[in-house]
Amino acid sequence: MRILIAGNWKMNGSRHQLDAWVDAMMAAGSVGVDLLVCPPFTLIERAARLLAGSGVAVGGQDCHAAAEGAFTGDVSAVMLRDVGATHVIVGHSERRAGYAESDAAVRRKAEAALAAGLAPIVCVGETADQRRAGTQKQVIGAQLDGSLPPGFSGIVAYEPVWAIGTGLVPSLADVAAMHAFILGRCGATQVLYGGSV
């Protein structure tokens, strides 16, 4: 299994910035790892077109569990696939907290992604209070149990909430231990780390 490096642009970027980034990526050449970029929805189709044939995959940052319907402002996994995405992030801590997304909601999104032919990246992570209490494995285990579709075999992103944008960095041993726990707990084929470095 090759290493996967994924970049989540969050709510940042413009066509000009995307074009400059793609030019830099093409100039850099092969880096010996799999690359995935997840720009805002408004840039996915352009990114997919510019990166076609480069080996750099393009993903969405979220999707709705329904394929279509009266869900103002939402984007379905089918729509992401239609504009060239191959992956989609679901259950990011910012969405779990800011939009009160439950494990069950994350599971439905992951199932929708799989049904649309996308590779879901299911995010899990503990808060600082949960880590201090020593309950991080119980928290992550419960998130995996609730968020992963039955028989899941795909990508899980471990994103300790306390290490996202805070400048706090977990030790390599802590990250490796959590990755081993996740791999042993579910059918994940890859585990990504998402947090401060």
What do these predicted regions represent?
Residues A6, G59-D62, V88-E94, I121-G125, ...:
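Short beta-strands and strand-loop turn motifs
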Residues P39, V90, Y158, T166, ...:
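Glycine-rich beta-strand-to-loop/alpha-helix junction loops that act as flexible
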Residues L36-P40, E68, G98-E101, Q130-A142:
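Active-site glycine- and acidic-residue-rich loops that bind
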Residues A116-G187:
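Active-site rim beta-loop-alpha module in soluble metabolic enzymes
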Residues M1-V75, D145-F152, A157:
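Conserved N-terminal beta1-alpha1 strand-loop-helix module at the mouth
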Residues D34, S54-G60, A119, R185-Y193:
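Short beta-strand/loop segments at the ligand-binding rim of alpha/beta enzyme cores
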Residues A52-A112:
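Glycine/small-residue-rich loop that forms an oxyanion/phosphate-binding "nest" at active or ligand-binding sites
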Residues M11, F41-L43, D62-H64, E94, ...:
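Active-site-proximal loop/turn and secondary-structure-junction residues that shape catalytic pockets
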